[in-house]
Amino acid sequence: MHPKSRYLLILLLALACRPLVAQERVELEQLYQPILERPLGVAPAISDSAWEQLIQKALDAPETTVTLQTKAQESLEMRIDKARLRCTISVSGLLTYELLRAPWRTQGERPILQITTLEQPYRVSQLTAFLPKQEKQWELDATIPYTDWLIHSEEKELVPSPSEALLAPLTEMPVVLTFTTEQGRRKVRISATPSLEGWTTKEETKRIKQLISISPQSYQLTRRGILKRIK
């Protein structure tokens, strides 16, 4: 390869791998602020200094898995997904936290997060305060993708665009829970809908009929996050 061509190639690679410019980084920090502040219960064993180092590395290289070795010999990994407003943190490959920002928030309150904890060799899903309170007005954010949150109906497989979603009230959202069955722990996807009695859920039969029951079962999700079956 010609020396000049080699130099240009190295320069292009350096530009492609450079950290985000200041403005892009500030915007990324603003979007991820609720996640970067480390919500209660997320990686409590990690020191504040290690968390801060991990965050800085992840912000410098979004869409890339960054690593950090702590003094306690813990291997930490973090990945920021810009497109989905999602952050994944792994502790020594045994414990993984997935934080996903919801595309809605309650007026006057902080953005809502869904936190899922995956522990090897078992998968444990934690639903953490992402259902908005019924008596307050919701605010939908057109900048956050709706793909992970809106339920696909059998008649219409396409997810509404953000502009369409802003025009119509959000009436359904997915909730992932873990049930203990005879076959072991199984992750179950249910759809939650607001009602006058509070938040109720109805399992999607096609997803779980082989695991729990052929007929759908109804549940009520209380404000404290407790799931109760409606008999």
For the regions a protein language model found, what residue spans apply to each?
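Terminal domain-start segments
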Residues: 23-102
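Bacterial N-terminal signal peptides
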Residues: 9-16
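Short aromatic loop motif centered on NTY/YTY
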Residues: 140-223, 228-231
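Bacterial N-terminal signal peptides that target proteins for export
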Residues: 1-8
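Short beta-strand elements that form the blades of beta-propeller/WD-repeat-like
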Residues: 110-118, 186-192
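Sec/Tat signal peptide C-region and signal peptidase I cleavage site
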Residues: 18-22
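A general "mature secreted/periplasmic domain" signal
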Residues: 115-116, 126-133, 137-142
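Short, surface-exposed coil-to-beta transition loops
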Residues: 94-96, 112, 122-127, 172-174, ...
